[in-house]
Regions:
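Short hydrophobic alpha-helices at membrane interfaces in multi-pass membrane enzymes
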Residues: 1-13, 42-47, 116-123
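Membrane-interface alpha helices of multi-pass inner-membrane proteins
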Residues: 5-20, 28-31, 51-55, 123-129
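Perimembrane helix-loop-helix junctions
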Residues: 25-50, 153
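Signature aromatic-anchored transmembrane alpha helix within multi-pass, membrane-resident enzymes
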Residues: 49-51, 145-175
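Juxtamembrane membrane-water interface segments that cap and precede transmembrane helices
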Residues: 67-99
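Hydrophobic/aromatic-rich transmembrane helices and adjacent perimembrane loops
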Residues: 128-155
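Short periplasmic/luminal acceptor-recognition loop of GT-C membrane glycosyltransferases, typified by
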Residues: 195-235, 250-262, 287
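Periplasmic/luminal catalytic loop of GT-C fold multi-pass membrane glycosyltransferases
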Residues: 232-286, 290
Length: 293
């Protein structure tokens, strides 16, 4: 057995400082240690397991990181199974692509006769993906390694490896520079919204909440939703769904609302007494309490 498994400890520490999915990384590590490594080197496996778990807390929050992960797993969106926590849907083109990709890789992994611990991880990730499609990317990434063991590329194809690597780097650079394609409000609308809000929190949907935050404004709730109290999470999800209970988000000091046109949220705001449309641009409508126009 390789001693390189100790590298998982610093890797998990770095990962935990970047994204909450490090918890899945810990799960994969524990599966390997318990199912395979513990039979040969139980004490080493135990040491790596303990240090790996501790590595998740190697963040500025320290032991409070445990509360963060608890909040991630128990947030209102996860409990309701909505948004990125929603189940796979054949009505979603991206989910269909995910299912087809995962099916091909899982078939390849099965033919390669994965190790027992790999099979355990694949099964668990597959079940997680069915209940929450956000986990699908980790299923696909993990399945690549065992599936690739069945591949025996021709010598002539190996010369394409450097070309493929260069193209991948170029594509990655383009994606980083371009950024994600999101439904966004115009900068002028965000500026006006902050001016009308006068320091009060802005209620916004989609990626618009992130724009408001980046511009220095306050938001009533947004992504990541687990950063807000559970009661606020539930009301915000009701509001996003266009549910009448979501109107509770407007009973406080919210004066300005930004929504994407044509959504259920916009339909709710259109019939909300006390709020009037104060402008629209690029598919985003701004509502103001009382109105200034």
């Amino acid at each position: 057995p390789s001693r390189r498994m100790w590298l998982v400890v610093p890797l998990l520490a770095v990962w935990s400082n970047l994204h909450g999915a490090a918890l899945l990384g810990l799960g994969v590590t524990l599966a390997y240690l318990v199912v395979q490594r513990a039979r040969r080197e139980p004490w080493i496996a135990l040491a790596v397991a303990v240090l790996s778990a501790a590595a998740l807390c190697a963040t500025p929050a320290g032991l409070r990181t445990v509360a963060y992960y608890h909040g991630v797993l128990t947030n209102a969106a996860a409990q309701r199974g909505v948004g990125e926590w929603g189940a796979l849907s054949l009505g979603s083109p991206l989910d269909i692509v995910l299912v087809l990709t995962a099916a091909v890789l899982l078939f390849g992994a099965w033919r390669a006769r994965p190790r027992l611990w790999e099979a355990v991880v694949l099964i668990v990730l597959a079940l997680l993906t069915v209940t929450a499609d956000r986990d699908g990317v980790w299923l696909v990434m993990f399945a690549v390694a065992p599936a690739a063991r069945r591949l025996a590329p021709a010598r002539s194809l190996r010369t394409l490896t450097p070309i493929a690597a260069v193209l991948a780097v170029i594509l990655l650079a383009v994606c980083v520079v371009r950024g994600p394609v999101l439904s966004q409000a115009s900068p002028s609308m965000v500026t006006r919204a902050l001016a009308l809000a006068h320091g009060t929190p802005v209620l916004a949907d989609g990626s618009i909440d992130e724009q408001v935050a980046v511009a220095g404004g306050r938001i009533w709730a947004g992504d990541p939703i687990d950063a807000f109290p559970h009661r606020v999470q539930e009301v915000y999800l009701d509001w996003l769904a266009g549910d009448a209970d979501g109107s509770r988000a407007l009973t406080g000091d919210v004066r300005v609302v930004l929504v994407t046109r044509g959504t259920r949220t916009q339909s709710l705001m259109a019939r909300m007494p006390g709020f009037v449309a104060a402008g629209q641009a690029d598919g985003v409508i701004m509502y103001e309490r009382g109105g200034s126009l």
